[in-house]
Every structure is written in C-alpha cells, then in structure tokens.
C-alpha cells in the first residue's frame, strides 16, 4: 500500500524554478459543495478551458504535502477520495504521469480545499495548471452512491497520502473498474483505458482471494454505480489481463 504513495501528455511539462510563493487568502465559512476550480468565463461569456500539464508521482505527493500544510494551519483535517490517473500514478504505479487529480469528498469544506489547491499550485516548482485538482466527478454522484463509495474506500484503505491536514484514499476498485468499462463503451475512449482497467481488475482479483471475477459481478457493479458495460468490453479487458498475467481475470 502506498503512503506518502492518465492521460497522455497534452502539453510538454514545464518546470519553474525560484518562483516566489504567493499568499492565499482563506475564504469565508464553507457552505456546501463548491466547484474546484471555480468555473471562469471569458469576456464573451464562454467557459474558459485551462491547459493541463502532466504530473509524476513525486510532483503529486509534493502538491498534496503543500495542501496538507495549508489545511493543517487552518485547523482542519480533511479526507478526499480519488479516482483516475492519480491512483494509477501514485498508488498502483501503472502510469508514469497524469494530467489531474479527480476527487470527491469533504463537500462542506470545499472552499478550504480550493484555497489549499491554489496554495499548492503557487508553491510547486513544476507547472500544475489551474485544473490540476478538480471535483467535477461530484456532479455525477448521487448522495447515496457517494456515501457508499466513502464507506467502501475507508474499508479498502488504499491510502495515497496521509499527513496532518489531508488524507487521500483511492476509490473502491470495483468503482474504478466500472468507470473504465463505461469509458470503453464510448467513442472517446483513450489509449490507456484498457490498461487502466486491467490494473483495477487485478486489485479486484486480489480482494477476491486471487480468484477471477465473474462477468455477472462486474455487470452488477456497473448497474449499482450507473456505469455502462458490455460483454465485448469485458472480453477485451479479460484478453488484456490474460496477456499481462497469463490467466483469465474475468469468467464468462
């Protein structure tokens, strides 16, 4: 398990040295979910699209460290739950980099998280980008599913980072796997989606005492989490798993 432990690069990674840290003003009292980062529009009212930069494991952990220090100074200790490339990069180490950190949790303290993420962006010696830390996945979670995921993630206890001020947990592996089955059914699937699915399937199998997962079980998880799945996608994932592990990971 990692403690103090994607997306293809869209722009070359740029490092900035000797950059002076700027002060961040803490917002007023929190009042429910706030989007992170705060949505912005240009002069004509169109949403601004921020560039993204690839971050490696060390850079992500340093950014989390800055966030933890900031939150600890504010007297808060928050838990968040992360999906996607940050999990692969930090915990599973199945990717070298990721373009952002997708998370949910601590909705009532989201202003603190927003300010902490800005502080980390300012302190970091690498370019994180304005969208490096975002909770847009919260928009797609019902209250019931979110609470279920939080409880399951705490039981799973796959910790990406934990210091006074901030603890970061991976989402349940079955949820992560279903996120990839959903993506693989769509036309905008990405080159790394299948390998990500294999990494998550491997964790599901470990939790199943080393036994392959029944296809019906994956389909049940997908229904539970409102994710798409198809037999052809499961066959594709299983074939990729067999190539890398020498045995089937999904039973049909």
Please provide the spans of the model-predicted regions.
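Compositionally biased terminal segments of proteins
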Residues: 2-252
């Amino acid at each position: 398990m990692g403690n103090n432990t994607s997306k293809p690069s869209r722009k070359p990674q740029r490092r900035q040295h000797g950059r002076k840290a700027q002060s961040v003003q803490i917002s007023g009292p929190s009042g429910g979910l706030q989007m992170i980062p705060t949505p912005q529009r240009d002069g004509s009212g169109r949403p601004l699209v921020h560039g993204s930069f690839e971050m490696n494991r060390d850079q992500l952990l340093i950014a989390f460290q800055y966030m933890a220090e900031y939150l600890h100074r504010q007297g808060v200790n928050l838990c968040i739950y992360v999906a996607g490339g940050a999990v692969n990069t930090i915990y599973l180490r199945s990717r070298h980099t990721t373009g952002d950190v997708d998370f949910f949790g601590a909705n009532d303290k989201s202003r603190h998280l927003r300010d902490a993420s800005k502080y980390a962006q300012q302190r970091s010696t690498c370019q994180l980008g304005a969208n490096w830390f975002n909770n847009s996945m919260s928009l797609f979670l019902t209250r019931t599913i979110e609470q279920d995921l939080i409880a399951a993630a705490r039981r799973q206890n796959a910790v990406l980072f934990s210091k006074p001020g901030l603890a970061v947990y991976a989402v349940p592996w079955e949820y992560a796997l279903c996120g990839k089955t959903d993506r693989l059914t769509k036309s905008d699937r990405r080159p790394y989606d299948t390998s990500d699915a294999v990494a998550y399937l491997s964790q599901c199998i470990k939790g199943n005492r080393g036994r392959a997962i029944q296809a019906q079980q994956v389909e049940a998880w997908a229904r539970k989490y409102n994710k798409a799945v198809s037999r052809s996608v499961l066959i594709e994932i299983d074939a990729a798993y067999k190539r890398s592990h020498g045995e089937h990971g999904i039973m049909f």
